[in-house]
Structures are given as structure tokens and as C-alpha cells.
Amino acid sequence: MSEMTPREIVHELDSHIIGQQNAKRSVAIALRNRWRRMQLDAALRQEVTPKNILMIGPTGVGKTEIARRLAKLAKAPFIKVEATKFTEVGYVGKEVEQIIRDLTDAAVKLTREEQMAKCKFRAEEAAEERILDALLPKPKEDWDTEKKDDTGTRQVFRKKLREGQLDDKEIEIDIAAPQVGIEIMSPPGMEEMTSQLQSMFQNMGPGASKRRKMTIKEAYKLLIEEEAAKLVNPDDLKEQAIELVEQHGIVFLDEIDKICKRGDTSGPDVSREGVQRDLLPLVEGCTVNTKHGMVKTDHILFIASGAFQMSKPSDLIPELQGRLPIRVELEALSANDFKRILTEPHASLTEQYVALMATEGVKVEFSESGIERIAQAAWQVNERTENIGARRLHTVMERLMEDLSFEASDKSGSTTVIDADYVNAHLENLVQDEDLSRFIL
């Protein structure tokens, strides 16, 4: 679990997302409160429930990006799901529980990686011995002896192995055969039975190893993973993973506005309202049966987000509104925000294009006037057509760089300066013509 302070979390989010300080502060506080809760005594800890968040804002302003970055910062089980997935044809009520099953799978993977990292030193030693055994096979008469022959020759090879002198040498070694993935088609609502059948068939499969020829460098990596996996206790793994989900799990529900009953429609809207009612027990707290064990959702943090262009937060059923007490509004982006998005974030769009062109030997420089004009063009198209926020920058940049990207392989060693004149020459007609910008940008 992350021990970062709210200020540190916001600072980290600032390096990837421009603006939206209110949303950043809310998720930072929510994440820090997870840590604060764990410092309480057990009795009080059970009473402190997470304050779920509803993020409201137009498309392309950073709602999903905040979730993506939060997943990396949290160091906790995290899953992002689209609420619209549960309104599809064939939907039945039990399917929402798949959210918790997927979250538990993520926790198992996270816990396994942590435990394997702790065993890495022992795994490296075991992998080293197996490679030395392959390089220096024992004589037939010594196969029954338990004591490993640690002669001077073995020590010489051990030294060479550690120094990387044998990395390119090929050896034949037994590697555990990967489990065969079995796909089972089942109707909606039968996910639990499907996962149990898959586990049963996989366990029935042979656990035999497969002899493969590869370089020592490749074999060493595979053997470390194999030996580390052997050192992980599966029962402890499941127990820790379930504890991790229950105490630190985070679920991001995207597009929640799409399961609202539309304000201007009459009559029942069974599918959408049904999804909301089935989400209620998860958000409020219930017990879900997973293949790893029973998981309680009482302390899982839910962050919901939606554009709410065709509906309002008040169109959600009252019970679900009550389970999302913290409301955060994200603001629409201005031309100045677009300018900052192009330059300030880590691995910004302009940095990406400069790096891509550099692989062809073409130097690209973005001038201040060029960046301003790109931002202005993207903002103008958003104003005249559909406002899709910062995603418009991807379309505009791709259109702007199209000619250069096509010709880059023939221009190795050249320098291209992208200033206002360059942008106008490549984009002005499209931006000015509303019909063209509607279909092309």
C-alpha cells in the first residue's frame, strides 16, 4: 500500500495531468485515508468505511487518466470497469460480482509478484546450481551421492557465470511446461462455475517439464521465475491476497452516467436501473464468492465517473447516490490548458513525436508559436463540432505530422521546425472549414 501523503500524490498526478486540482485532491485524500485507517486499532478500523467518490465532467478532461495514474501510485489491487458492460444483451444480475472476482485475481497477481521478489535471492542461487548441473553433468557412478560435487572446476564455472562470460553459451535444460489455457463457453451468470472447471482441467494436465535448448542468459531468467514460484506458499498467497482486496482494493466505475435513466424518457428503463440496483450491494458491502475464497466488499473504495451530458447525477437511483457521498466536478479544458498539455506532462505528445522522428534521424523542434497554434486549432474544432476534450489533440497532432511521418525515412539528418506557419499550412483549411473538421479532425 502506498504511504504517500496527499500533497505527494497530487504532485505525482500533476506530472501527468494538467489542471483538475479538486479531483486530484479528492482521490489523494481517499488514498491517504486508506493508510490512516490501517493505523487504527482493529475495533475502530472495522467501523471506518471508505468515502466513495463520484467524478463529474465532460469527456476528455482527465477522469480516466486520473484512474490510470492512481492505479500505479496505489500499490494496491485496482480494477477499472465500464458500467455499460453490464447493460449488454443477455445481462443477468450476478454478473456485477465479476468485478470483485477480477479484483481478487489482480490482488493474487500482485501478491505473488511481491512474494517472488522476497524469494529472489534464494531463487537465484537455485537457478545457478541448475545451470551448473547442466554445464557439468555428474559422472554416472556419482548419481546416487547426495552431496553436491563442489570441485574447483565448478567454482571456475560459477565465477564465469556470475561475470556474464557464459551468457551466450547454449545449454539444454528442463523447464516447467506452461499450463494449457482452456476456454469454456458459458451463459452469463455462470462465471464462477466456468473458473472452477478451468482450474480442474488445468490441474488434471501434466506437470511435466519440457527440455529446451537456449542461451544461459535466457535460461537463467526462466529458472529464477520457476524457482521463485516453487518457494511461494499457495495457501498463504490466497490468504494475503484476500486480505489485500478487502482492506485496500479500489474499483473505478467508468461511464456510470450511461446506466442512468434518461431524464427526457418516459416508461421503465429496466436494464439501466437493474444494473444500478445490482451494484448497490457491492458498494454498500456484501460477500462475494471467488475461486480464491470469500471476499467482503465493505472496505473496498469505489470511484465512479461520468460525463453526465445526457443525464444528471440526480438521475441515479437515490440509494446509489447515497453511496457516493463525495462529488467532484472536473472543468472543461481551455486553449491554454491544451498548450500546457502539449508541453508540461511527463512524456507529453510533443516529446513523443520528437522521439519517434529521432529514430529515423530526423530532428523535430516545436516552437512556442507552433504549440500555441496547435492548441488553438484543437480548441476551435472542439468548439465548432463535438467537444471531446484533450483527445482532440491526438487527432490534430496526427494530422499535422502525417506528411513528415510518411517522408521521415527519406529525410535522415534533416531538421524540421514546427512553428505557427507550418501548422497553418497543414491545418488551416481543415480548421476553418466546419464540414471538413467535423469529418477529418
Curated annotation (Swiss-Prot):
This protein's record includes keyword Chaperone: yes
Residues binding ATP: I18, G60, V61, G62, K63, T64, E65, D254, E319, R391
Main location: cytoplasm
Subunit structure, as described in the record: A double ring-shaped homohexamer of HslV is capped on each side by a ring-shaped HslU homohexamer. The assembly of the HslU/HslV complex is dependent on binding of ATP.
GO molecular function: ATP binding; ATP hydrolysis activity; peptidase activity; proteasome-activating activity
Function, in words: ATPase subunit of a proteasome-like degradation complex; this subunit has chaperone activity. The binding of ATP and its subsequent hydrolysis by HslU are essential for unfolding of protein substrates subsequently hydrolyzed by HslV. HslU recognizes the N-terminal part of its protein substrates and unfolds these before they are guided to HslV for hydrolysis.
Keyword Chaperone: yes
Family: Belongs to the ClpX chaperone family. HslU subfamily.
One of the GO BP terms on file: proteolysis involved in protein catabolic process
Protein name: ATP-dependent protease ATPase subunit HslU
Gene Ontology, cellular component aspect: HslUV protease complex
Subcellular location: Cytoplasm
Keywords in alphabetical order: ATP-binding, Chaperone, Cytoplasm, Nucleotide-binding, Stress response
Highest taxon of the lineage: Bacteria
One Pfam family from the record: AAA_2
